[in-house]
Amino acid sequence: MKRKSVYTCLVMLLMSLALQAKDKDVAVAEALLKRLLPSYIESFQFQKLKGEKDCFTIESVKDKIVIGGNNANSMAMGLNHYLKYYCLTTVSWYADIAVEIPEELPMVGEKVVSEARVDTRFFLNYCTYGYTMPWWQWKEWER
């Protein structure tokens, strides 16, 4: 009987830890934010959205910018959208150039919802592989 209660407690502990475990996509988005805007990490929150189609949402909840996405790439798109249209800034390809944003982050009025229009998309022009990318280091790729 005692052994059964120990096993029950162990299973309950493991289940509660599993529920508290951070989603991998959320962790990846947070790592991106930490690289780009380390002093603003507490001002943002990322949430995993359900669904297969790529999408992101952006909203202000209390004093935080909440970005949702169905995967890490969608969350990164949401962060880029917020930086571009609310902070009026861009993220340079050059890893040594800091992202400049207002000291006080602009709040999002109405919730932003964006969904991919097509299933398959591509990134970059194939010619760029011969112009700059062969000389990139990991910090450029990671950015």
Describe every region a protein language model picked out:
Residues 1-8:
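Bacterial N-terminal signal peptides that target proteins for export
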Residues 11-20:
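Hydrophobic h-region of N-terminal signal peptides that target proteins for export
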Residues 31, 38, 51, 61-143:
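Feature activates predominantly on carbohydrate-active enzymes
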Residues 32, 36-37, 43-45:
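Low-complexity, Ser/Thr/Pro/Gly-enriched N-terminal "stalk/linker" regions
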Residues 22-27:
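Cleaved targeting-peptide boundary
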Residues 43-49, 55-58, 68-69:
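Long, folded non-catalytic interaction modules
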